[in-house]
Amino acid sequence: MSMQDPIADMLTRIRNGQAANKAAVTMPSSKLKVAIANVLKEEGFIEDFKVEGDTKPELELTLKYFQGKAVVESIQRVSRPGLRIYKKKDELPKVMAGLGIAVVSTSKGVMTDRAARQAGLGGEIICYVA
């Protein structure tokens, strides 16, 4: 059976891993997943990530906790294969009044809503993280 939405699967693995207090989660890798993991690491939502394997690369995310609680309070898919959500630069949402981030896929790559606003770019809203 093929996976319909690999990004939603990635977000669910992160959510479930933190609910079970796992140190790390693994998943099949792709360029988009690595780009999302890079944004999550830069923003401090995950500890680290690495890609292992040549024929079937696996992405391993090291989850982050603060005083025993998961750093990621909520992670939510926005744009999905059945309903893509695109926003212009001045329509980009602020997640939790700026405390969270929106991960945006732009023509210049995957970045946060803050970085996209500064660069004057709009794009596809992949997910919200808080």
UniProtKB/Swiss-Prot annotation:
The keyword Acyltransferase does not apply. The keyword Ribonucleoprotein applies. InterPro entries: Ribosomal_uS8 (IPR000630), Ribosomal_uS8_CS (IPR047863), Ribosomal_uS8_sf (IPR035987). Keywords: Ribonucleoprotein, Ribosomal protein, RNA-binding, rRNA-binding. GO terms for biological process: translation. One of the primary rRNA binding proteins, it binds directly to 16S rRNA central domain where it helps coordinate assembly of the platform of the 30S subunit. This is Small ribosomal subunit protein uS8.
